[in-house]
C-alpha cells in the first residue's frame, strides 16, 4: 500500500521523502544498543542516596518534572516511585509558574528530565524553586551532561545521548527508552534500600491483579 494516502492533511499525490528508513530489526537493534551504552560511571549511588536522605530520612517528597515526552516519562517515574514506597509527584514546569510551585516544600528533592539539558521551562523551574528554597537539591537525567541544566544540579545522570531511531532523527525514541530505564534503575534501587516488602506493596495496591498477587505472595511468605 502507498503510505502517502494515510497521513492526515496531506494530498495523496504529494511526493514523500524521508532521510532514512529503518527495518524492524534495525529499530530493535538501535534500542538495545542505546541501553547497552548507558554510562556506568553515572553517580547512581549519589542519586539513590539523595532520594533516601530527603524522602525516607527527612520526610520530604520526590518531585519529578520535564516538558513534552520527557515530562511524560517524568510523570511515569513519579507514579512508579509512589506505588513502591517513595512518596512522589509530577510537577509540570509551566503550571509551576502559575501557582503549582506552592506544592514544593523545603525538605523535597527534585528529579528533572531534559534530553537537551537546556529546556527553557525546566531551567526557569530551577531558578524559581531556588528563589523559594535555595538549598533544595536537584537530580537530572539528560543526554547532554555539559548543558546549562547540568551545571545547576547536584547529581547528573547521562543517557549517553543515543541517536534517535526515527526516520527524521528528531522524534524522542531511543532517548525516552533510556530515560525510562534510568527511572526504573532508581525505583528498584530505592525499593531495595528501604526494604520494600509484599506487605508494603499490598497496602498501596488494593485492587487489580497486582494487589491480589502481592497479598497472595505475602501469605506464602509467612
Feature annotation, model-predicted:
Residues 4-5, 9-57:
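An N-terminal, well-structured beta->alpha segment
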